[in-house]
Regions:
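Conserved small/polar residues in nucleotide/adenosyl-binding loops
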Residues: 210-212
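Active-site-adjacent beta->alpha loops and helix N-cap segments on the catalytic face
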Residues: 43-55, 102-113, 159-171
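Active-site mouth loops of central-metabolism enzymes
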Residues: 8-21, 70-79, 122-132
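Short, acidic/polar
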Residues: 17-29, 81-87, 129-142
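Acidic (Asp/Glu)-rich catalytic clusters
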Residues: 27-31, 48-60, 90-92, 108-115, ...
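Alpha-helix-loop-beta-strand connector modules within alpha/beta enzyme cores
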Residues: 49-71, 171-177
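Glycine/small-residue-rich loop that forms an oxyanion/phosphate-binding "nest" at active or ligand-binding sites
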Residues: 65, 69-100, 107
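Catalytic beta/alpha-barrel core
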Residues: 15, 36-44, 66, 95-106, ...
């Protein structure tokens, strides 16, 4: 019998305005076959850590928690100190992944570096730097990581299909690294990279609910 190629895991990102809508969207995502759900906490008009803990315990090892900063596309107007306090509280939720922007991680690496379920993310919403530039960025982040379960996520905007090639070339460079690499491109030209990234080594891919 021939070995079947395993189906890639995919993560659905949800930016809900309130906790009621968030719960229903999470249920819809899992019913549609999602393996993971990313919760954009910055989109919620209000929430409590106890509520997020309840979700984390209900959906063990299936949630990615993130609170994007304003300059990284975040939707909340809270102060940076308040945002950092929330991120710190999320570290107590052991059954969920935490996605932290690279600049926040670099400024507070001692706080986050030992988190087992950590995703350090870097986004460029306008273009895709060279493969060498992205490699330097990844190496600098990786120096502060400490666990093989940790993930570095690189997301760039593809103005052409060649931009996707720049990202593809990252995977063989970091194949034997002490972390996992998750890299793909945004935009119409970058759509194909979401499909190909798990074949190159990404632990999972990101999709919207309408694409499931």
């Amino acid at each position: 019998m021939k070995n079947r190629i395993s189906e890639p895991k995919f993560c659905v990102s949800i930016a809900a305005p309130n906790t009621s809508k968030l719960k229903s969207s999470i249920n819809s995502a899992f019913l549609s076959g999602a393996h993971l759900v990313e919760i954009r906490l910055d989109s919620l008009n209000s929430f409590s850590i106890n509520f997020i803990e309840e979700l984390s315990n209900t959906h063990k090892n299936k949630l990615v928690l993130t609170f994007r900063s304003k300059h990284q596309g975040g939707l909340s107007n809270i102060s940076e100190s308040d945002r950092l306090q929330i991120l710190n509280q999320l570290l107590d939720l052991k059954h969920s992944f935490k996605d932290i922007e690279s600049d926040t991680f670099n400024r507070n690496s001692t706080l986050f570096k030992n988190e087992k379920n950590l995703i350090v993310s870097w986004h460029n919403f306008n273009s895709t730097p060279s493969t060498n530039s992205l490699s330097v960025l990844i190496k600098n982040i990786s120096k502060k990581l400490s666990r093989p379960t940790q993930i570095i996520k690189i997301v760039t905007y593809a103005n052409s299909l060649n931009d996707c090639n720049k990202v593809y070339k990252l995977y063989p460079r970091f194949k034997k690294s002490k972390f996992q690499l998750l890299a793909f491109c945004m935009g119409e030209n970058g759509s194909i990279s979401r499909i190909l990234s798990p074949m190159l080594g990404a632990p999972f891919i990101y999709l919207s609910l309408i694409h499931i």
